[in-house]
Swiss-Prot record:
Pathway: Porphyrin-containing compound metabolism; bacteriochlorophyll biosynthesis (light-independent). Its EC number is 1.3.7.7. Protochlorophyllide reductase is composed of three subunits; BchL, BchN and BchB. Forms a heterotetramer of two BchB and two BchN subunits. It is an enzyme of class 1 (oxidoreductase). It comes from Pelodictyon phaeoclathratiforme (strain DSM 5477 / BU-1). Substrate binds at G428, L429. This is Light-independent protochlorophyllide reductase subunit B. Component of the dark-operative protochlorophyllide reductase (DPOR) that uses Mg-ATP and reduced ferredoxin to reduce ring D of protochlorophyllide (Pchlide) to form chlorophyllide a (Chlide). This reaction is light-independent. The NB-protein (BchN-BchB) is the catalytic component of the complex. Its cofactor is [4Fe-4S] cluster. Pfam families: Oxidored_nitro, PCP_red. The active site is at D292. [4Fe-4S] cluster binds at D36. Gene3D superfamilies: 1.20.89.20, Nitrogenase molybdenum iron protein domain, Proto-chlorophyllide reductase 57 kD subunit B. Coiled coil: none annotated.
Length: 535
C-alpha cells in the first residue's frame, strides 16, 4: 500500500458511495473505524445538491473487538428507523477485511428483512473507485432488473452517470437535448436519480447508452446478455464523434423498430441540434479554420486521464483542432489495452500507464508541451512549470463542478472544449504582453518607479547608484548548484521570452551551452543556441 495522498483514484468506498449517493431510497452503511466517513464532506463540498449524502458509519472500535461485539446490527436498525430506505448497501473496509468479519452474518443479526440488505463483498485492498462503482452498479442491475414489455415508442437507458461525475448534469442535458430532437424518450437514467423501481424497468428500453468506459459498460453488457438489449458504448465527444454517435444510435433503434413495425427515425437537418434551432450545431469546424486557430497546428499537446476522456481528447485535439500529440496516458491500468487500441496511430510512442502523479509531472517537465489536458493533479504540476493546463476528467476540484451549462458531450460540448483549449493556450500571451510593455496606464502610472523583476538576481543596486559598465558585465546570476551561470545581459534577453515558454528556452539553452563546452551563458551563447534550435 502507498500513502493515500494525491491519488488518481479514490478508495472502494468512494466508488460505492458514488453509486448509492446517486440513487433515491438507497443508503450506504460503512463498517469501518471512526473517521472513515470523511467521504460525506466530499459530496457536500463538490456535488452542490440539496440532499445530504446517504451514508452512515458503523464504527469499529478496539473496545468492541475486545468484548467480541459489533455495532453493525444496531447501526442497520438505526438507519432503518431514521431513513426508511428501500435498500441498504453494506460496504466493507480494510479493517473488516483484516478482521475477517462475516458481514452477511452480522447483517442477519439486525433483524431486518434480508431483501432490503445488499452486502457488497469486495476486497478493499485490491479494488479502487471506478472498479467498485462499476461492479456495484452491475450488481444492482442483476438483482433488480426484471422482464418488461418494451415501450411503444423508441426509448433508451442512460447508464454510468454517477454522483461526482465529470460535468455530470451538463452532459446529461446535452444528451437529452439530442435525444429529444430525434424524438427518442429516456426510459431510465442509472444510477443518477434512479430508484429501485427504475432499475426494474431497465429492460423496457430499446437500447442502452453507456458512454463511460469506467462505469456502466459492464451493466450494459449484462443487459445485452440477459435481455438481448443492444448497446451504444461510444462517447459523443467532438463534432465528428457526435455525428457518428447519432448515426449509430439511429441505426440501432431503427433495427429494433423494424421488428415492431415502428416508423424509422430520420436524421433531421443539423441546425435542429443547435441551441437556437437555426445555426450550425457547433462552431468548431469553422473556428478551426480561422487564422487564429490555424496556428494551433504547430502546438504540442499532452493528454493524461481516465480511459474515456483520454481517448476522446487525443482524437479531438488532433483530428478537429490539428494539434500535435506528443504523448498520452492513463492511470487506469485495467483499461489500458482498450486505450491503446483506440489510439493506434495517434501516439508517437508507447501509451503511458501509471498511477503516480510524480511520473506524469516529470514527463511534462521533460517535454514542456504547449498544452496539457489532464486531471486536477496535472493542473497543480503545470502551475509550477508555467505550462497551460485544462482539466478534462476526474479527479477534479470545485472548479469542475459548475452550476452553469458546460457539457463535454455533444455539439455543445465540442464548443466548450474548443473554447477551453483556445483560452488555456492564449491567455498566457496577455500576461506576457503586460509584462513586456507594461500595463499601458490601465491601472496607474508610476514613471519614476521601475517594475520589479519577476525573477531574483544576484546583483543588488541602490536607487541612486549607477554601476559601471565593467561591473555590470562581470555580474552574473548565480544559479542553483549544478546549473549554468547566466550573465545579466543574457538574463535580460531571456526575460523577453514569453513566460509560458521561458523555462523551456532556459533549459534548451543550458543544454546547448553544456554541449558546446561553455562555462557561462552570455548573449552570444544565447543567440547561438537560438539559431541552432531553429529560433
Amino acid at each position: 500500500m502507498r500513502l493515500a495522498f494525491w491519488l488518481y483514484e479514490g478508495t472502494a468506498l468512494h466508488g460505492i458511495s458514488r453509486v448509492t449517493n446517486s440513487m433515491k431510497g438507497v443508503h450506504t452503511v460503512y463498517h469501518a473505524p471512526q473517521g472513515d466517513d470523511y467521504i460525506t464532506a466530499t459530496y457536500t463540498m463538490l456535488e452542490r445538491t440539496p440532499q445530504f449524502p446517504g451514508l452512515s458509519i458503523s464504527v469499529v472500535r478496539g473496545r468492541d473487538l475486545a468484548q467480541g461485539v459489533s455495532r453493525l446490527p444496531s447501526t442497520l436498525q438505526q438507519v432503518e428507523h431514521h431513513y426508511h430506505p428501500e435498500l441498504i448497501v453494506i460496504a466493507p473496509s480494510c479493517s473488516t477485511a483484516l478482521l475477517q468479519e462475516d458481514l452477511h452474518q452480522l447483517a442477519a443479526h439486525s433483524g431486518l428483512p434480508q431483501e432490503k440488505i445488499l452486502v457488497y463483498a469486495l476486497n478493499p485492498f485490491r479494488v479502487s473507485e471506478n472498479e467498485a462503482a462499476d461492479g456495484l452498479l452491475t450488481e444492482l442491475v442483476k438483482r433488480f432488473a426484471s422482464p418488461q414489455e418494451k415501450t411503444a415508442q423508441p426509448s433508451v437507458n442512460l447508464l454510468g452517470f454517477t454522483s461526482l461525475g465529470f460535468h455530470l448534469r451538463a452532459n446529461l442535458t446535452s444528451i437529452r437535448r439530442m435525444l429529444q430532437t430525434l424524438g427518442i424518450a429516456v426510459n431510465v437514467v442509472a444510477p443518477w436519480g434512479a430508484s429501485i423501481d427504475d432499475l426494474r424497468k431497465l429492460p423496457a428500453a430499446w437500447l442502452n447508452i453507456a458512454p463511460y468506459r469506467e462505469i456502466g459498460s459492464t451493466a450494459a453488457e449484462y443487459l445485452a446478455d440477459a435481455f438481448a438489449m443492444p448497446a451504444l458504448y461510444e462517447a459523443p465527444i467532438g463534432v465528428e464523434p457526435t455525428l457518428a454517435w447519432l448515426r449509430s444510435l439511429i441505426e440501432k433503434l431503427n433495427a429494433a423498430g423494424a421488428e415492431r413495425g415502428v416508423a424509422p427515425i430520420v436524421m433531421p437537418q443539423l441546425n435542429a441540434f443547435s441551441l437556437d434551432g437555426l445555426s450550425a450545431p457547433s462552431g468548431v469546424p469553422w473556428f478551426a479554420r480561422t487564422a487564429d486557430m490555424e496556428s494551433f497546428s504547430n502546438k504540442r499537446a499532452f493528454v493524461f486521464g481516465d480511459a474515456t476522456h483520454t481517448v476522446a481528447l487525443v482524437k479531438f485535439l488532433r483530428d478537429e483542432l490539428g494539434m500535435q500529440i506528443i504523448g498520452a496516458g492513463t492511470y487506469l491500468e485495467r483499461h489500458a489495452d482498450w486505450v491503446r487500441k483506440e489510439l493506434e496511430g495517434y501516439l508517437p510512442g508507447a501509451l503511458i500507464v501509471t498511477d503516480k502523479f510524480q511520473d506524469v509531472a516529470q514527463i511534462i517537465d521533460d517535454q514542456m508541451p504547449d498544452l496539457v489536458c489532464g486531471t486536477q493533479m496535472e493542473r497543480h504540476s503545470c502551475r509550477k512549470l508555467d505550462v497551460p493546463c485544462m482539466v478534462v476528467c476526474p479527479p477534479t476540484h470545485i472548479e469542475n463542478h459548475l452550476l452553469g451549462y458546460y457539457p463535454f458531450f455533444g455539439f455543445d460540448g465540442a464548443d466548450v472544449i474548443a473554447d477551453r483549449v483556445y483560452l488555456s493556450c492564449k491567455l498566457g500571451l496577455e500576461k506576457h504582453l503586460i509584462d513586456f510593455f507594461g500595463d499601458a496606464g490601465l491601472e496607474y502610472e508610476e514613471p519614476e518607479v521601475s517594475a520589479p523583476s519577476e525573477e531574483p538576481v544576484a546583483l543588488s543596486v541602490a536607487p541612486n547608484d549607477h554601476p559601471s559598465p565593467e561591473a555590470a558585465a562581470e555580474a552574473v546570476v548565480i544559479a542553483e548548484e549544478g546549473e549554468m551561470k547566466w550573465s545579466d545581459e543574457a538574463e535580460t534577453m531571456l526575460k523577453k521570452v514569453p513566460f509560458f515558454v521561458r523555462k523551456k528556452v532556459r533549459k534548451n539553452t543550458e543544454t546547448f551551452a553544456r554541449a558546446s563546452g561553455a562555462s557561462m551563458i552570455s548573449v552570444d551563447v544565447f543567440r547561438q543556441a537560438k539559431e541552432s534550435l531553429g529560433g
